[in-house]
Amino acid sequence: MSKEKFERTKPHVNVGTIGHVDHGKTTLTAAITKVMAEVRGGEFKDYADIDNAPEERERGITISTAHVEYESEIRHYAHVDCPGHADYIKNMITGAAQMDGAIIVIAATDGPMAQTREHILLSKQVGVPYIVVYMNKADMVDDEELVELVEMEIRELLDEYDFPGDDTPVIFGSALKALEGDISDIGVPSILKLVDALDSYIPTPKRDTDKSFIMPIEDVFSISGRGTVVTGRIEAGVVNIGDELEIVGIKDTKTTTCTGVEMFRKLLSSGEAGDNVGVLLRGTKREEVERGQVLSKPGSIKPHAKFEAEIYILSKDEGGRHTPFFNNYRPQFYFRTTDVTGACQLPDGIEMVMPGDNVKMRVELLSPIAMEDGLRFAIREGGRTVGAGVVSKVTD
């Protein structure tokens, strides 16, 4: 039995392990659950549990992900670990597992490798804000100078992708020794040090209700004598009766006022993140609003049509395309609640994109959508999902 009841009072932070294949991500994940279960209660997950991660489907894409949880003195952590390299890429691009911070695992015996670099770049592109380093397999290196070299190399690599290399915590240890209960510095204490680094280096994320109000519009009705009602699920923030709001995307931005909030046929004085509501708008005609626009706090989000994106294209086995696509491919981009056609520009030197590939590209939409960096979307052809992506940079 676990020693203490799970408390919902601690702030919740999402993290995950990233890094090159066989550098010890899954062993480290198991070691953290074991050490923290002994210190704080909770459940120990062994290597096999994590490695046999069930397949999940996110936007039609098959991803194997293991979810574990543990508590530190001040926080509750939800931690994701993926068995395969492709799973990481899919996970990060679809946002199936949003990370407030990542633990990059690097074998001291190898130093940073190709996938280490790719995961750091992807973290930057998809907006993982903080990275902590665990230098693993410390039990297999005797050469102090080699360790310092690897540490220097990883800090430089982080700098290269605009992470603060000099300030990043680097913890030196052996996940395997920690899992075996070894109490020398590189064993259990290295895990405690790592969790301390997560606590102190990754800030507590802003709660959704503290962010600016935004609600993607799913449907529009007019109620005679009362005006226009838009319905949807509030993505972030809070809306109160009397608030001035903007309707953003597709058409020119319009200003309106909230005169009522309804949920399950009951009138509320306000609605907050996560609520499915109807918002009554004053002075707005039904034909001025459509699905795919968003209702937002004035000035908080702007419409854009051009952006750079990091994209994953489904493989044939995932129900995606059977053939590659080329420059100027024009699928539909599904943002929040609607499809908008856009043209794709491939990077120099890339002639085509095969099913199962991930690629960075520039996109220009036919009509603008309320958008900011980090927004996720699906790529569709005639209602069938053929890819997923994330806006890495708005360019207009």
UniProtKB/Swiss-Prot annotation:
Residues 60-64 are annotated as: G2. GTP binds at residues 19-26, 81-85, 136-139. Mg(2+) binds at residue 26. Residues 81-84 are annotated as: G3. This is Elongation factor Tu. It comes from Vesicomyosocius okutanii subsp. Calyptogena okutanii (strain HA). It holds the Pfam family GTP_EFTU. It is found in: Cytoplasm.
